[in-house]
Amino acid sequence: MVTVTITIKPYLARYMYVRYAQSLEPESESRPSPSSSASLRKPIPIHLSHITPIYHFLYQLSVPHPSKVSWKETGNITFVLPNPAYGKNPEVYNYIGQESALTIEKEIEVEMRAELYEFLLENKFKNGIMFKRSMELFVEHYNMEGTVEEDSLMRAFKRWRKTVSYTHLTLPT
């Protein structure tokens, strides 16, 4: 098992560890939580399924380790690199550069926001729960308290909702 550790926004790292808790490496579960500040160990590796988009980003963006770059990995999230039957060997292609890490971070943020927006809309229209309370529940469930401002997520949701409702009003002629 070859792993790669990258640095992403702290709230996205927490989201991933809760979202993919069932995909954590079994022998690593006894280690301290990656969200604890006392932990100086490498975060627990997440083993993603081949059906997740992030798995394919990891596969496509992994490159051979550059000779002038340290082998010491730092970051707040660790992934097990894909090991397909054919294609890139993770023993060789085991490095994710800074730009690639930003690309992966953006994809994680897209996944998180899609889940958040679906959660907010479903709670509002099926369960009658107000957006603010739903946002609090989402942030609490994914252990993101203190790492993200709920107001910024709510503003982004409202901008998205305004854009979506505007595009539905203007039909092509």
Label each region the model flagged.
Residues 147-162:
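Major-groove recognition helix of helix-turn-helix-like DNA-binding domains
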